[in-house]
């Protein structure tokens, strides 16, 4: 059997590029449920969103108690090419549970999105909350969200974020964020790091944001998180 020798770096790069493109073409499959969270089958990500089928997500809010008085949430800035909520500030880490996965398996998202290794035992479970979001005529998002909190004093530079999914990371003071949600203030100033796509480097960033700059979540969703944080203090 003859094994073809790889001639140089250019050929290696081409092999890696092809491999990455092939991995992107893999169809994601989700377990799907009825409104009572009883499993009814399996379907593709595309069909799940097109048909508005209930599915599960893993969501983790990272809380830093050293950045500002009262603590701060870590938010990710969604990449402009995301199919849902491009360019908006979102949960620290979140992802769909694949077919056959259990909730604890979702902890892999922290490694994939933020480059940190965390065990499920290091997270605090807030609970499950069901939410429906009609994003467009093509996307009806019905999710059973399993929500966790991870307390970490990492700096922004300690995270190796997934640059094809995330454009930046920001700390947002929890008290100010709560006032923004309650309509007591219109804007807040946040600081973080953002990917400069021209220079392909991470640079500091400061921006003034309002409620519409964040992905939408219900009042009940945020109460679930804030109540759990209060119980931990």
Predicted regions and their residues:
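Alpha-helical and coiled-coil interaction segments, frequently adjacent to or embedded
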Residues: 2-17, 21-23, 28, 196
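A short coil-to-beta-strand element that immediately follows conserved catalytic motifs
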Residues: 117-127
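Conserved Nudix-box catalytic region and its N-terminal flanking loop in Nudix hydrolases
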Residues: 19-21, 47-59, 68-113
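Nudix hydrolase/Nudix homology domain
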Residues: 3-8, 127-135, 139-233
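Residues that flank catalytic or metal-binding motifs in active/ligand-binding sites
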Residues: 26-28, 56-58, 93, 125, ...
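A positional/architectural concept
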Residues: 28-62
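Short, well-ordered beta-strand micro-motif
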Residues: 62-64, 77, 149-151
């Amino acid at each position: 059997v003859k094994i073809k020798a790889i001639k140089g770096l250019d050929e290696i790069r081409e092999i890696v590029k092809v491999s990455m493109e092939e991995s992107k073409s893999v169809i994601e499959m989700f377990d799907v449920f009825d409104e009572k969270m009883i499993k009814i089958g399996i379907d593709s990500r595309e069909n799940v969103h097109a048909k508005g089928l209930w599915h599960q997500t893993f969501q983790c809010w990272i809380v830093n108690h050293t950045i500002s008085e009262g603590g701060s949430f870590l938010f990710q800035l969604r990449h402009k090419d995301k199919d849902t909520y491009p360019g908006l500030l979102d949960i620290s880490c979140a992802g769909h549970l694949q077919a056959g996965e259990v909730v604890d398996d979702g902890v892999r998202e922290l490694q994939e999105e933020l480059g940190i290794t965390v065990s499920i035992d290091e997270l605090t479970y807030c609970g499950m909350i069901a939410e429906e979001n009609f994003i467009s005529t093509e996307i009806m998002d019905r999710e059973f969200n399993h929500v966790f909190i991870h307390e970490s004093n990492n700096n922004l530079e300690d995270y190796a974020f997934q640059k094809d999914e995330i454009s930046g990371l920001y700390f947002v003071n929890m008290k100010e964020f709560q006032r923004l949600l309650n309509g007591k203030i219109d804007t807040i100033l946040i600081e973080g790091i953002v990917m400069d796509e021209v220079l392909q480097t991470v640079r500091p960033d400061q921006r003034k944001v309002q409620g519409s700059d964040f992905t939408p979540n219900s009042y009940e969703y945020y109460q679930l998180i804030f109540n759990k944080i209060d119980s931990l203090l």
